[in-house]
Amino acid sequence: MGDVLISDRPPSPARLSHTSEKHPRVTLTELNVLRRHRELCDVVINVSGRKIFAHRVILSACSPYFRAMFTGELEESRQTEVTIRDIDENAMELLIDFCYTSHIVVEESNVQTLLPAACLLQLAEIQDICCEFLKRQLDPTNCLGIRAFADTHSCRELLRIADKFTQHNFQEVMESEEFLLLPVGQLVDIICSDELNVRSEEQVFNAVMAWLKYNVAERRQHLAQVLQHVRMPLLSPKFLVGTVGSDLLVRSDEACRDLVDEAKNYLLLPQERPLMQGPRTRPRKPTRRGEVLFAVGGWCSGDAIASVERFDPETADWKMVAPMSKRRCGVGVAVLNDLLYAVGGHDGQSYLNSIERYDPQTNQWSCDVAPTTSCRTSVGVAVLDGFLYAVGGQDGVQCLNHVERYDPKENKWSKVAPMTTRRLGVAVAVLGGYLYAIGGSDGQCPLNTVERYDPRQNKWCAVSPMSTRRKHLGCAVFNNFIYAVGGRDDCMELSSAERYNPHTNSWSPIVAMTSRRSGVGLAVVNGQLYAVGGFDGTAYLKTIEVYDPETNQWRLCGCMNYRRLGGGVGVMRAPQTENYMWIRKDSVV
């Protein structure tokens, strides 16, 4: 025989660990058999005379409601038969069946009784399933009813989805009988939303008047209350005068006449618009339609340019609009009060502190805006709480940490707290009431640091840094995340992208763009994220690409007329055709 190898280590006891996958299922099945045979049952649930036998321990394990009932000092904890009122007996039986079987069928015939019962018993999983079922049933003819049902039962997620569906499909919803039957409070909740998806404000006015005329006798008293949420200053002059101003119901109400006069003044006095801003002058932000993208200035063919062009996603066309009076590369661009501001930049010879303002209704630039206190190029510009902020940049001598803000009512710039870090080529974004300054360069090397400004405290604080150093990057807020794309690190132009979650204070990567892009513009247009122009390390770019968050992919979607590096981008509502031809003051009465 050969040698037998014997270990010097002491023998360890033999072990075999086992977790049964069948055990929970088999146990529940047997418990349900006991219930069906009324064996070992220690409680009877009486609902509208129907008696349902069960075991306290099973009900308590599944339902916080029953657990509180049976383990506390309530009288029911000592009763063998418990009566529960204000709940459907069929729904109760289905829910107790679920406690024993893990199975339930939700359908049109039971969802309206099942959801309230699940809410009472605090069966969160069933609440979620019922809400998911109702989400799938949403259509323009029933979304208002589902919304009211969700509101009644405090189903916040279903209420949010129903609201979003109603806003997005408003043009079909306004034709439904449910819409005509709305109580005035719910009507106001809907039409006051910035997210209402309409081709023009005329549709909102027509919807309100259809609702009113469905029951004039009772609803006439609410006309002014409702019409104050129609954004009449955004109506075309022709519709305002010919339809709204001539309506007998409107003319017979003093408060309604005041609303019409307010809108006329807004249309007739464009120079006064900064002083007339309010909820009725704020354009709505409908999904997937109505917005256009402006590409402003930049660097092309070895020189700064003044050209400006406009992209309409519905036609996928780029069209030239009026150029600025000055060439501007490294220009900061933002939209405030329906006007496009171009701040600072470099004209190819000198650094600029001048500002121009574009009115899409007249297709004209004006230069009557007060200049910034410092010359700035590669500056970040954004709007927060009705003020225009200019952040960082360089003045030809040094990289800046200066921040100032513009008050359109006073036509005046004032300094606020400086950033903790000097930043040129910085990207800025506004989210949750804060102004974020992202990346850039301190004059020596690219940065991955991020800080945010709280206007309530006039203070900057650091937040989590990006995973990549980036200067001359693109930045935008999309679906409550801050997206940072492209730019340049220490070595090369970048195609990589990442996004910031303010709730977790963390950055996470997303898929890279199809091209490397430094000096890229980033903007959200009609619910889609566009990256515009830039420099790939070899050539200036005129291509644009769009990001799809569902597929996590970028795709090319056309070209500008001009190649642009360091141009600014801004998004505005598409101007109505009628408003391109300005009208004489005496034609609006």
Swiss-Prot record:
Residues 41-108 form the BTB domain. The gene is dbo. Kelch repeats lie at residues 292-338, 340-386, 387-433, 435-480, 482-527, 528-574. It comes from Aedes aegypti. This is Kelch-like protein diablo. The keyword Transit peptide does not apply. Residues 1-22 are annotated as: Disordered. InterPro entries: BACK (IPR011705), BTB-kelch_protein (IPR017096), BTB/POZ_dom (IPR000210), Gal_Oxase/kelch_b-propeller (IPR011043), Kelch-typ_b-propeller (IPR015915), Kelch_1 (IPR006652), SKP1/BTB/POZ_sf (IPR011333). The lineage of its organism: Eukaryota, Metazoa, Ecdysozoa, Arthropoda, Hexapoda. Residues 143-245 form the BACK domain.
